[in-house]
Amino acid sequence: MNLIDLILIAIYVIGISGLIFNKNNIINILIISELNLGTLGMLFVLASVELNDILGELSGLYILTFTAAESAIGLAIVVILYSKTGIINIRHLNKLKG
């Protein structure tokens, strides 16, 4: 385990703690989840380079694609929530029903 791996693991732990302590703002939750998935993708790529295996790189690419889709859907929900309520708060998501 080298220094880059330790830095990425530290960033991932910071992101998890951000999810634990921040539960109200949707934008922050989206940014933290992007950070976590990005670091996981980088860890997969670094592991595949160290092991000389292509599956880690393919997994990193899959995670990157999933992250982009999650970001687009999340931002669409934020735009709809803001246009209906004028507030970006996770507690107001129930106002999007029907």
UniProtKB/Swiss-Prot annotation:
<dbReference type="GO" id="GO:0031966">
    <property type="term" value="C:mitochondrial membrane"/>
</dbReference>
<keyword id="KW-0812">Transmembrane</keyword>
<dbReference type="Pfam" id="PF00420">
    <property type="entry name" value="Oxidored_q2"/>
</dbReference>
<comment type="similarity">
    <text>Belongs to the complex I subunit 4L family.</text>
</comment>
<feature type="transmembrane region" description="Helical">
    <location>
        <begin position="26"/>
        <end position="46"/>
    </location>
</feature>
<feature type="transmembrane region" description="Helical">
    <location>
        <begin position="1"/>
        <end position="21"/>
    </location>
</feature>
<dbReference type="GO" id="GO:0008137">
    <property type="term" value="F:NADH dehydrogenase (ubiquinone) activity"/>
</dbReference>
<keyword id="KW-0496">Mitochondrion</keyword>
<dbReference type="InterPro" id="IPR001133">
    <property type="entry name" value="NADH_UbQ_OxRdtase_chain4L/K"/>
</dbReference>
<keyword id="KW-0520">NAD</keyword>
<keyword id="KW-1278">Translocase</keyword>
<dbReference type="InterPro" id="IPR039428">
    <property type="entry name" value="NUOK/Mnh_C1-like"/>
</dbReference>
<dbReference type="GO" id="GO:0042773">
    <property type="term" value="P:ATP synthesis coupled electron transport"/>
</dbReference>
<keyword id="KW-0472">Membrane</keyword>
<comment type="function">
    <text>Core subunit of the mitochondrial membrane respiratory chain NADH dehydrogenase (Complex I) that is believed to belong to the minimal assembly required for catalysis. Complex I functions in the transfer of electrons from NADH to the respiratory chain. The immediate electron acceptor for the enzyme is believed to be ubiquinone.</text>
</comment>
<protein>
    <recommendedName>
        <fullName>NADH-ubiquinone oxidoreductase chain 4L</fullName>
        <ecNumber>7.1.1.2</ecNumber>
    </recommendedName>
</protein>
<keyword id="KW-0813">Transport</keyword>
<keyword id="KW-0249">Electron transport</keyword>
<keyword id="KW-0679">Respiratory chain</keyword>
<dbReference type="GO" id="GO:0045271">
    <property type="term" value="C:respiratory chain complex I"/>
</dbReference>
<keyword id="KW-1133">Transmembrane helix</keyword>
<feature type="transmembrane region" description="Helical">
    <location>
        <begin position="61"/>
        <end position="81"/>
    </location>
</feature>
<keyword id="KW-0830">Ubiquinone</keyword>
